[in-house]
């Protein structure tokens, strides 16, 4: 944690960074297996973000589960669930299985009467992801759907996802 803070502050002062992307938030090596340490690391990042007006984005791993992508919640995190307490926003993202695309539909507005099916592409590089906004201190908590083309690393937000009624 001390090293992480030192690295971020070094770049902040030398390069005037405004954004930090931290791949897979986890505890420092001395505290592997201590669930509360992940919350401590998240608190350090949150304090840096607030005190230095930084945008800090991090990923967390989901636990292996059979939870449908639209039903994800904080209990699907592989790490300590208490990390949610210190986050401003928590988005849980999971790939929608190609074989279950027919079970989902999306709309362009959160409250809508027109829905669209998820198109099944022959190209295996085209995939869909559900994004459940589990926490948002700034407002709404929708469930969104994104289409990703892995070949070009292009993400398209399609709209609001739901299971077909």
Where are the predicted features?
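C-terminal regions of RecA-like/P-loop NTPase motor modules
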Residues: 1-20, 44-52, 65-165
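Conserved P-loop NTPase "ATPase switch" module shared by AAA+ and STAND
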Residues: 15-31
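Structural recognition of the conserved hydrophobic beta-strand(s) that form the central parallel beta-sheet
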Residues: 21-22, 54-61
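Active-site-proximal loop/turn and secondary-structure-junction residues that shape catalytic pockets
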Residues: 26, 62-64
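Flexible beta-alpha connector loops of hexameric P-loop NTPases
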Residues: 28-39, 68-75
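A short alpha/beta connector and helix-capping loop motif
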Residues: 32-48, 56, 91
